[in-house]
């Protein structure tokens, strides 16, 4: 199963490149799910209306059950957002990553190149993305089960399926540290208050003693 999506809103560049890929996957009887994005759906469907899709070949505007689709996939095509890549690698999926251009500090390109460098996927920059370049990458990987399996293993190695537990532990650690600091400050304040109270009591005693009148004797003439 090939899963393709261009982020929650879709990607025109990916959609344009996928037209040839979808045609060839239909011809080769490959199972796929392609989420076009709601705003691009009608346009994409019009471009492939001559094709007869099988029940296991789906083009949808938006994928409601991404978790199960991702778990069932053998190859993922998508952008290089941090959350997407975390999900892909947590499940050990080989991927073709297409980083969006003009993202903050070009982080998607760095993400994609990191995945490729570690052997977990193939990176195709948006400026180099064409229907032919994407189709060639898909055809190569689907035709080479050994390479696909190797990528899956590498993806699993760099994935962090326990990430949510690590994040929870870190939050708990910070929370406990803050509480400990607050408690320490509270106890310190209480201690100072008690010291001030003791000091005031001592001063009051001194004032009471010093305010006692002296008996002045009257001399008889």
What are these regions (language model features)?
Residues 147-161:
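A short, well-ordered alpha-helix in the C-terminal region of glycosyltransferases
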Residues 160-194, 213-221:
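C-terminal alpha-helical cap of glycosyltransferases
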Residues 62, 82, 100-104, 128:
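Short, acidic/turn-prone active-site loops that include or flank metal/cofactor-
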Residues 130-143, 172:
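Two-component system phosphotransfer/interaction surface
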Residues 78, 94-105:
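Short hydrophobic beta-strand element within catalytic cores of glycosyltransferases
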Residues 71-86, 93-94:
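Acidic donor-binding loop of glycosyltransferase active sites
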Residues 1-76, 109-113, 117, 124-133:
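Donor-nucleotide binding loops and adjacent catalytic segments primarily
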Residues 84, 105-112:
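Short, glycine/polar-rich helix-capping loops at beta-to-alpha or helix-loop-helix junctions
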